[in-house]
Amino acid sequence: DQIPLAQMNTSMTINATAAWLLSLYIAVADEQGADRKALQGTTQNDVVKEYLSRGTYVFPPRPSMRLTTDIVVFTTREMPKWNPTNVCSYHLQEAGASPVQELSFALATAIALLDSIRARPEVSAEEFPELVGRISFFVNAGMRFITELCKMRAFVELWDEITLGRYG
C-alpha cells in the first residue's frame, strides 16, 4: 500500500483473473485517494487465448467474453489511461500454430471482442471508436525472419482494413 499507484504504469499479464485482480488494484488506488482517471497500465485480459493455447480458463467462453468486455467498457470510461485488453497470439505459436494461424486467430479474437462490445446496449455508437482504439496486440516473432516480417506487415494492413471496413 506504499506504492503510489497513480504515479505508476502497471502491466498485468493476467487473463482469467483479470476482473478480480484489477478490482483489487482499483480498491487499493481508491484507498490511496488516487484519481482513477490517472491510473495507467494494461491488463492482458485475453480469455480466448486461455482456451486456444494454454487451457488455463476459469469460465466457459460466453461468460469469459462478458468479463472481458466488462473490463474494456469500464476502464475506457473510468480509467482512460488504462489499456483494457491485449490480444495475445504469442502463445499460439508456442503451442504449435504457424505464423499464418497465429495471425488469423489474433484477428478473429479481436473481431469477436469488438463485435461483443458493439452488441452491448450501453455502448453508444459515439463511444465505440474509443473502445476500438484501446485494443492492443502481443504477437510472436519466431525464427523464420522473412515469414515473421511479412506476417507483421500483413497484420498491420489487415487490422486497418478490418477496423475501417467492419467498424467504420
Indicate residue ranges for each PLM-predicted region:
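Well-ordered alpha-helical scaffold segments within catalytic/enzyme domains
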Residues: M143, I162-T163
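Short, intrinsically disordered, charge-balanced linker/junction segments flanking boundaries
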Residues: L164-G168
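Composition- and surface-driven signal marking solvent-exposed, interaction-prone regions
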Residues: K151-M152
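Catalytic alpha/beta active-site cores
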Residues: D1-E148
